[in-house]
Amino acid sequence: MSFDGRAYRYSGPGTLSAGPLEVRLANQSPVALDSFWLVIGKLLHGRTLADVQAVIRSGTATRVPAWFKVAGIFPAAPYAQPAWGVSLAPGRYALVCQRVRDGALYALTTVTIR
């Protein structure tokens, strides 16, 4: 699974096998202090990416919703290309990016783990 922090874009399959995964990040932002975190969260109770987007759009979230179980938070410093490991159980997961300099959140996509 790969994420490009400059374009806020996930590249990879929509369905992956359960178990250990490598998460590759690429922070090629032209802004020197523009680090980000990629957050992977399991969506519970039939929630979808639209629900995540609605929380972000509301601008009032002060905590993670109970239906979004954080499975991993992966930082990428400016100009870095780190690789992280995570083990995911079956389910549907949302990928969310948070830009560190201003806290802006971007709901990117969902990935199904089988």
Which stretches of residues belong to each language-model region?
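Extracellular/periplasmic metallocenter environments
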Residues: 1-7, 14-18, 26-36, 66, ...
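Contiguous segments within soluble domain cores/interaction surfaces
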Residues: 20-58
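Short amphipathic beta-strand segments in non-cytosolic proteins
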Residues: 43, 61-70
